[in-house]
C-alpha cells in the first residue's frame, strides 16, 4: 500500500425487495442503478476500501439487506458499511454481513483512522439490558441526524485514544448541510462541540440529502455523495443520474474527493418542478408534499 489511501464511497443505495414500491416515489430502480455504477467504476483493484454511508435499504427489511450484501460482495476489495435513517438496527446488523462486507466502527490505515458513526444513534431507545433499539411504532424515514450522548462520547473516546495522526468521519447525515430541509440546529451543535475539541478530525463523508456537493464546517471539508435512488442538483435545478464519490487520503492529512455520475440516457438530466424545489428549500415538509400530490391526483383522476 502506498502513502495515499484510495477509497470509493457509495451512499443511499436504497435497495428494494423484488416487487416492492419505493418509499416516497420518484425513485430509480436501485438494483439497475447499482449495476450501472458498478460497471461505470470498472477496474477497482487499486482501491483500498469501499465505504457505504447508510440508507442501504429502502424499508429496512431483511430481504433488502441480503440483496445489498450480495451486491457489495461483488467488489474485490473490503467494503465497510454504516447505517442511515432508513436502516433498522436488527435487520441491518443481521443481514448486511458477508465475507468482505463488514460494519466495523473504526478502521486504521497508515496515518489515518476512519470512524464510522451512527448519525441516528440519538433517536434510539436504550433497553434495560443496555442494548439500543429503534423505538417501536416510530419511523425515522425522514429524520435528521442526532448523535446523542452515547455516540458523542464514543467519538470523543476514539479521537482521544487513537494513535493515528488524522481522523476522517464517515456517517449518513452530513453535519450542518447546506440544504435547508436537512438542517438541524441541535445536530450541528453536537458536531461543533466535537470539532472544537478534536483538531485531528480532517473531514467528513456523508450522504442523506441526495444532492451531491461539498462545503466546509469549521475549516473541515464535508463531502456529500450521490445516491442510487434519485439525485438532484440545485444549480441548475435538475435530476441527476446515480453515482458515487472517489477519495484520495494523503499521509500529510490532505483529502481530495470527486463526484462521479453515470453518463447514461436512462437517467437524463431533466429539470425538476417547483414542488421539489420548495421541499429542498425547507418551505414545505414531506407530509405537505404528499398532501399536495394527493390533491392533484384527485383532481386529475390519476
Task: Report residues per predicted region.
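Short N-terminal helix/helix-N-cap motif within the alpha/beta-hydrolase-1
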Residues: 18, 61-62, 90-91, 178-179
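Extended active-site neighborhood of metal-dependent phosphoesterases/phosphodiesterases
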Residues: 62-157, 161, 190-200, 216-230, ...
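Short, flexible/disordered intra-domain loops and linkers
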Residues: 20-29, 179-185, 233-237
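Active-site-proximal beta-strand elements of phosphoester/diester hydrolases
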Residues: 4-20, 111-126, 168-172, 221-226, ...
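Binuclear metal-dependent phosphoesterase catalytic core
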Residues: 213-302
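N-terminal active-site segment of His-dependent metallophosphoesterases
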Residues: 1-67
Amino acid at each position: 500500500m502506498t502513502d495515499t489511501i484510495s477509497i470509493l464511497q457509495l451512499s443511499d443505495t436504497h435497495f428494494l425487495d423484488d416487487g416492492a414500491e419505493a418509499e416516497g416515489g420518484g425513485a430509480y430502480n436501485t438494483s439497475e442503478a447499482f449495476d450501472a455504477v458498478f460497471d461505470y467504476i470498472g477496474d477497482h483493484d487499486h482501491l483500498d476500501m469501499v465505504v457505504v454511508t447508510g440508507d442501504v435499504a429502502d424499508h429496512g427489511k431483511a430481504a433488502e439487506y441480503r440483496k445489498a450484501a450480495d451486491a457489495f460482495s461483488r467488489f474485490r476489495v473490503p467494503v465497510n458499511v454504516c447505517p442511515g435513517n432508513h436502516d433498522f438496527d436488527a435487520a441491518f446488523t443481521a443481514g448486511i454481513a458477508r465475507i468482505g462486507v463488514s460494519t466495523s466502527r473504526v478502521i486504521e490505515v497508515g496515518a489515518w483512522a476512519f470512524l464510522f458513526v451512527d448519525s441516528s444513534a440519538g433517536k434510539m431507545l436504550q433497553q434495560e439490558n443496555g442494548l439500543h433499539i429503534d423505538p417501536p411504532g416510530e419511523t425515522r424515514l425522514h429524520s435528521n441526524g442526532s448523535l446523542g450522548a452515547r455516540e458523542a462520547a464514543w467519538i470523543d473516546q476514539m479521537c482521544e485514544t487513537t494513535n493515528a495522526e488524522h481522523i476522517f468521519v464517515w456517517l449518513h447525515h452530513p453535519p450542518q448541510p447546506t440544504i435547508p430541509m436537512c438542517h438541524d440546529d441541535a445536530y450541528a451543535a453536537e458536531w461543533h462541540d466535537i470539532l472544537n475539541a478534536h483538531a485531528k478530525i480532517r473531514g467528513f463523508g456523508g450522504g442523506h440529502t441526495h444532492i451531491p456537493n461539498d462545503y466546509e464546517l469549521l475549516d473541515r471539508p464535508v463531502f456529500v455523495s450521490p445516491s442510487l435512488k434519485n439525485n438532484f442538483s440545485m444549480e441548475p435545478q435538475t435530476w441527476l443520474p446515480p453515482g458515487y464519490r472517489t477519495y484520495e487520503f494523503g499521509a500529510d492529512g490532505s483529502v481530495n474527493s470527486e463526484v462521479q455520475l453515470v453518463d447514461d440516457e436512462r437517467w437524463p438530466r431533466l429539470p425538476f418542478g417547483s414542488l421539489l424545489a420548495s421541499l429542498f428549500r425547507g418551505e414545505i415538509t414531506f407530509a405537505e408534499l404528499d398532501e399536495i400530490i394527493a390533491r392533484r391526483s384527485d383532481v386529475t383522476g390519476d
